[in-house]
């Protein structure tokens, strides 16, 4: 009897424990399903074949140099076909180790260098696959005033927004310059920010491994304890995730904040208010986000200051008709300097390749700056560039006999052609001679491939 009672007691306890386990298990499963329904298993979505293939196509379209393994984009495709399953298996097991990035230094206009980190093609593809699935999560969360590295937004939209605020009376700006922003992102802060919205911890850990992958410089791998190197497909999104905290903070304070990547402008209606903003924004960036504000370059300034207000290469002006966007003086100087280089006498051994290079550069420049009001400036540069091309052609003709024959062929009377062809005047002077201008007129040069800046500007600017 005692034995039966003891057995019955054990059985009752076992049943009770089993029922408790079943209830707890069901509760856990319900919570897990609710969690999964809120955000699907993100890592599986990232590594889904269609997403991965789309990522490779994007990397291929962007071209780019090899990473430390020397593998080109063309060589990566057969490698991926053969090893994709192996790579994904390692990622699922948490065993995938990204390669260090290859350090590349690009000269900056101010004389410094911009450090890029070039990942391998395989890692670029993986980063792109991650980015494609994170963008839909983060886009609704980003501030309206954020314009860099975002779909259907551009630098032109950013400067137009500044113009809009200026028209509302926000005529003082705080221009913030962050020192080595991409290289100094705090990993701990960034990972914690990611965890707020990325619920699949495996994805967070994969991103963390990319952040910690290191950089190879002069054959030596250096650990990366901070930063997200420019050059990776994931870095632009991570940069926006990081500074979105700043955007949202000043949005709460009712401060107009326009940001393009790490180029930040805060706007105020008085100089005193802008000075307070400079102090509070610097404090937030340095204390909360652990970034370094370049105090020499960060400043308060009127948005109409001819030299001092510069945002994304643009400036603002105003006249009797109101506020308008213009090209900053430094941007003009850089544009003319590059055109001078492309049309130099040394480069004009063959005129057609030079004209093509000028066309490619000038067209890209106008597509970017075409929003600005600059008709008179463009007309001036256009006339100057025509003059330089005539000078190049005159130099290319070299011998007096060749110059004479070509001038006559182009309709210049023989006696006049002979005088000009045998002149000892310098190239720049002769190329501005009336007969040379007539012989090498705009129509003929355009037919030869000259890119007329004035005509191109009119067609671009009419859209604004």
Q: What residue ranges belong to the model's regions?
A:
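Core structural elements
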Residues: 47-52, 100-102, 109, 349-369
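Conserved polymerase palm-domain catalytic core
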Residues: 90-105, 109, 141-303, 308
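Short, solvent-exposed helix-loop connector elements
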Residues: 223-226, 324, 340-353, 365-377, ...
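Non-catalytic, polymerase-adjacent accessory regions of viral genome-replication enzymes
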Residues: 1-81
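A conserved non-catalytic segment of reverse transcriptases
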Residues: 212, 288-356, 361-363
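Extended C-terminal regions of large enzymes
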Residues: 388, 397-464
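Phosphate/adenylate-binding "loop-and-lid" substructures adjacent to NTP/NAD/dNTP-binding pockets
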Residues: 66, 70-110
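A glycine-rich phosphate-binding loop feature that marks nucleotide/adenosyl-phosphate handling sites
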Residues: 297-306, 357-361, 378-386, 401-410
């Amino acid at each position: 009897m005692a034995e039966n009672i003891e057995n019955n007691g054990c059985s009752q306890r076992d049943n009770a424990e089993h029922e408790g386990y079943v209830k707890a298990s069901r509760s856990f499963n319900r919570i897990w399903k609710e969690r999964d329904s809120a955000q699907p298993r993100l890592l599986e979505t990232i590594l889904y074949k269609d997403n991965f293939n789309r990522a490779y196509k994007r990397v291929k379209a962007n071209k780019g140099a090899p990473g430390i393994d020397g593998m080109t984009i063309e060589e990566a495709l057969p490698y991926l076909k053969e090893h994709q399953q192996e790579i994904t298996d390692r990622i699922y097991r948490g065993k995938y180790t990204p390669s260090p990035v290859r350090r590349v230094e690009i000269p900056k206009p101010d004389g410094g260098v911009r450090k890029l980190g070039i990942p391998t093609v395989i890692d670029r593809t993986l980063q792109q696959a991650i980015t494609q699935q994170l963008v839909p999560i983060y886009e609704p969360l980003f501030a309206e005033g954020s314009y860099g590295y975002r779909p259907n937004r551009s630098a032109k939209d950013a400067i137009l927004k500044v113009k809009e605020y200026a028209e509302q009376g926000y005529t003082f700006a705080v221009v913030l310059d962050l020192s080595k922003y991409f290289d100094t992102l705090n990993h701990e802060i960034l990972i914690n920010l990611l965890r707020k919205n990325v619920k699949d911890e495996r994805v967070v850990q994969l991103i963390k491994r990319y952040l910690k992958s290191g950089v190879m410089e002069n054959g030596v791998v250096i650990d990366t304890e901070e930063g997200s190197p420019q050059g990776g497909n994931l870095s632009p999104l991570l940069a926006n995730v990081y500074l979105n905290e700043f955007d949202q903070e000043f949005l709460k304070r009712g401060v107009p904040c326009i940001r393009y990547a790490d180029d930040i402008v805060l706007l105020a209606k008085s100089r005193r208010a802008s000075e307070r903003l400079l102090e509070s924004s610097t404090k937030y960036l340095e204390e909360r986000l652990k970034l370094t504000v370049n105090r020499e370059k960060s400043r308060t300034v009127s948005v109409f200051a001819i030299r001092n207000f510069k945002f994304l290469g643009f400036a603002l002006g105003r006249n009797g008709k109101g506020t308008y966007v213009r090209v900053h003086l430094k941007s003009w100087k850089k544009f003319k300097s590059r055109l001078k280089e492309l049309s130099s006498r040394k480069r004009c051994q063959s005129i057609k390749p030079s004209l093509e290079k000028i066309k490619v550069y000038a067209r890209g420049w106008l597509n970017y700056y075409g929003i600005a009001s600059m008709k008179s400036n463009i007309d001036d540069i256009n006339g100057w560039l025509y003059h330089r091309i005539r000078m190049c052609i005159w130099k290319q003709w070299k011998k007096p006999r060749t110059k004479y024959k070509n001038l006559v062929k182009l309709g210049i009377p023989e006696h006049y052609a002979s005088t000009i062809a045998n002149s000892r005047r310098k190239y720049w002077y002769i190329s501005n001679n009336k007969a040379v201008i007539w012989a090498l007129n705009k129509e003929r040069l355009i037919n030869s491939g000259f890119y007329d800046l004035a005509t191109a500007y009119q067609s671009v600017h009419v859209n604004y």
